[in-house]
Amino acid sequence: MEIILANPRGFCAGVHRAISIVDRALDIFTPPIYVRHEVVHNQYVVDDLRARGAVFVEELDEVPENSIVIFSAHGVAQSVRAEAKRRDLKIFDATCPLVTKVHMEVTRASRRGQECILIGHQGHPEVVGTMGQYDNPQGGIYLIESPEDIKKLEVKNPNSLCFSSQTTLSVDDTANIIKALREKFPKIDGPRKDDICYATQNRQDAVKALAERSDLVLVVGSTNSSNSNRLQEKASCVGVNAYLIDSEKDIKTEWLENVKVVGVTAGASAPEVLVKEVIARLKKLGGTVVTENLGVEENIIFEVPAELRIKQID
């Protein structure tokens, strides 16, 4: 049984930055360090940081006064920032810069009084944070998840309207929604550059190429990871069996029956150590040759805050 690895896979620049912020804060300051929401959607990463002294909370009222708190990679609403400032909490912001770009789009629309449509998944923390950038009662912000939502959408002024997107959606699905938006609202403004992040696009392209060569695809990632779920969907659309797994322990031997080629990829929040463990398990189950697809080289780096760029000397 051949094992093929997708390329690129795993951590993106935004995830690297977010984890590094928590990691360095734990090294520099005395724990506990509070993190609002899971810093990234991966159980392995969260458990590792928790063991080192990170305390994950959902709301700031769980954080003691004068504590250090880190905002997750998904971003937060303006009301959360205001509360943190009011309570004199020391903040480190791990919001992905590409999410911040979408926040700025929505903020500009709010200041102009232009209504905004956000394409995203209800309840996802990135969506909650992005919706929370809009605060102009003269306008409005609306969440849509599918072309069907657009049919029943009513806005105040279709001539002053823009749209933005959650960064981790399927590129193809977003294209269909945008097409429907432009058909209903011909004057709608869109971002100058697609909101779907480079890493999401690259990993979706890579998993499609992987699925075309595979009899089975395993996507390493947690079930609450939007981008990991999209990878599993993309592989399935090619016509192969595809499963989302948290770790090698989730692999079922019956999946491998009559499989000659198994493809492996990982969501943007899944560490490479989990991929290596999956490969090791597959080898025990009959895997032999391990190869890696050619893919896009990613060399983007997002810097951590200046206060955390301190070299530790033992």
Curated annotation (Swiss-Prot):
Record pathway: Isoprenoid biosynthesis; dimethylallyl diphosphate biosynthesis; dimethylallyl diphosphate from (2E)-4-hydroxy-3-methylbutenyl diphosphate: step 1/1; Isoprenoid biosynthesis; isopentenyl diphosphate biosynthesis via DXP pathway; isopentenyl diphosphate from 1-deoxy-D-xylulose 5-phosphate: step 6/6
Details of cofactor binding: Binds 1 [4Fe-4S] cluster per subunit.
GO BP: dimethylallyl diphosphate biosynthetic process; isopentenyl diphosphate biosynthetic process, methylerythritol 4-phosphate pathway; terpenoid biosynthetic process
Positions contributing to isopentenyl diphosphate binding: 41, 74, 124, 225-227, 269
Cofactor: [4Fe-4S] cluster
Catalytic site positions: 126 (proton donor)
Keyword Calcium annotated: no
Reactions performed catalytically: isopentenyl diphosphate + 2 oxidized [2Fe-2S]-[ferredoxin] + H2O = (2E)-4-hydroxy-3-methylbut-2-enyl diphosphate + 2 reduced [2Fe-2S]-[ferredoxin] + 2 H(+); dimethylallyl diphosphate + 2 oxidized [2Fe-2S]-[ferredoxin] + H2O = (2E)-4-hydroxy-3-methylbut-2-enyl diphosphate + 2 reduced [2Fe-2S]-[ferredoxin] + 2 H(+)
InterPro entries: LytB/IspH
Residues that bind (2E)-4-hydroxy-3-methylbut-2-enyl diphosphate: 41, 74, 124, 167, 225-227, 269
Binding locations of dimethylallyl diphosphate: 41, 74, 124, 225-227, 269
UniProt-listed CDD domains: lytB_ispH (cd13944)
Name of this protein: 4-hydroxy-3-methylbut-2-enyl diphosphate reductase
Source organism (scientific name): Psychromonas ingrahamii (strain DSM 17664 / CCUG 51855 / 37)
Designated gene of the protein: ispH
